[in-house]
């Protein structure tokens, strides 16, 4: 087994043990603990590329989780899976649902921008300049929001915004 895989397994096992301890000692309801358990299992399955299993766990977690902040991360992870599978419309739906519950989720804003940027590139390949401009403008809007929340992140997006003349309304620019 490669060293990096051993380290990953060690980290996964350590996380699982710590999560189990936290679940036992936190003063939370049975439903909250069960929701977290499903969420944790979903993250584990997702990291192993077992997307169908991850989705099952995330959907179970959504049924039980009541906290909007926690639900936003479950929805975000579901969006990640759909994006990984090339199902961009579904991914966008879940990212937006996550943002409705937690507007301070820069990674969701970034991923929405990435999808719109990809669609802009596809439109160029299809020689649809009007659609490409629309998609690139949408990407710019979401990247600007992500950068406002996390100014030290998304350097490639910041460079793209600058080089395309779309960098505006961001503090310091």
From Swiss-Prot:
Membrane topology field: Peripheral membrane protein
Entries under Gene3D superfamilies matching the protein: Tetratricopeptide repeat domain
Any one biological process term the GO annotation gives: photosynthesis
Alphabetized InterPro entries for the sequence: PSI_Ycf3_assembly, TPR-like_helical_dom_sf, TPR_rpt, Ycf3/AcsC/BcsC/TPR_MFPF
SUPFAM superfamilies: TPR-like
Classification via SMART domains: TPR
PROSITE patterns: TPR (PS50005), TPR_REGION (PS50293)
Record keywords: Chloroplast, Membrane, Photosynthesis, Plastid, Repeat, Thylakoid, TPR repeat
Pfam families to which the protein is assigned, alphabetical: TPR_1, TPR_8
Gene name for this UniProt entry: ycf3
Similarity remark: Belongs to the Ycf3 family.
Compartment annotation: Plastid, Chloroplast thylakoid membrane
Protein name: Photosystem I assembly protein Ycf3
Primary localization class, coarse: plastid
GO cellular component: chloroplast thylakoid membrane
């Amino acid at each position: 087994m490669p060293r990096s895989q051993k380290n990953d397994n060690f980290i996964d096992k350590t996380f699982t043990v710590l999560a189990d301890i936290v679940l036992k000692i936190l003063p939370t309801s049975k439903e909250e603990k069960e929701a977290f358990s499903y969420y944790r299992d979903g993250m584990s399955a997702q990291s192993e590329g077992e997307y169908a299993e991850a989705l099952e766990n995330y959907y179970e977690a959504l049924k039980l989780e009541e906290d909007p902040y926690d639900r936003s991360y479950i929805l975000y992870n579901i969006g990640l899976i759909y994006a990984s599978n090339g199902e961009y419309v579904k991914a966008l739906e879940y990212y937006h649902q996550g943002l409705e519950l937690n507007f301070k989720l820069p990674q969701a804003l970034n991923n929405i921008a990435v999808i719109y940027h990809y669609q802009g590139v596809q439109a160029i390949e299809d020689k649809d300049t009007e659609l490409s401009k629309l998609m690139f403008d949408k990407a710019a809007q979401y990247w600007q929001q992500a950068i406002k929340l996390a100014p030290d992140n998304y350097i490639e997006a910041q460079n793209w915004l600058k080089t395309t003349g779309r960098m505006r309304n961001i503090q310091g620019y």
